[in-house]
A protein has these predicted regions:
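Intrinsic N-terminal pre-sequences and regulatory tails
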Residues: 2-4
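Basic/aromatic-rich interaction segments and small domains that mediate binding to polyanionic partners
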Residues: 10-110
Length: 122
């Protein structure tokens, strides 16, 4: 995995360019080898959110040891920064969450990495 502390990269997403960022999360073992169960918790506009998703281990940066059994560990999940929306940042997770789609709006302060304005690729 690339250096998780490096500045954001650029990636072409459909017709626009978006930054790559990371969001803090709690990480547990997944059902399969190379898979993690990820929980993202945050507060946005007075609403407490708790989202769960599965992610390939290449999309998750662990701060320390790997999770095992029931033990959760701190980490960050890689996201595509799609733009600013509704006072927050619209990001795309590597997989859909268990309670919504892959795109979620989070507070800007939650996203680590560069957040750039979207630029038409034409």
């Amino acid at each position: 995995m690339a250096n998780p502390h490096a500045r954001g990269e650029l990636e072409r997403v459909d017709w626009q360019v978006a930054g790559i960022g990371r969001i803090p999360c709690k990480v547990a073992e997944g059902l399969w080898p190379g898979q993690f169960s990820v929980t993202i918790e945050f507060e946005f506009k007075g609403q407490r959110e708790r989202l769960r998703t599965l992610a390939h281990d290449s999309d998750v940066y662990l701060y320390g040891e790997r999770p095992s059994g029931d033990r959760l560990v701190d980490g960050e999940i890689r996201v595509r920064v799609l733009g600013k929306l509704d006072g927050g940042v619209l990001v795309r997770l590597p997989q859909e969450t268990l309670n919504s789609g892959p795109n979620i709006v989070v507070p800007k302060s939650l996203v680590r990495g560069e957040i750039r304005e979207l630029i038409p690729s034409g």
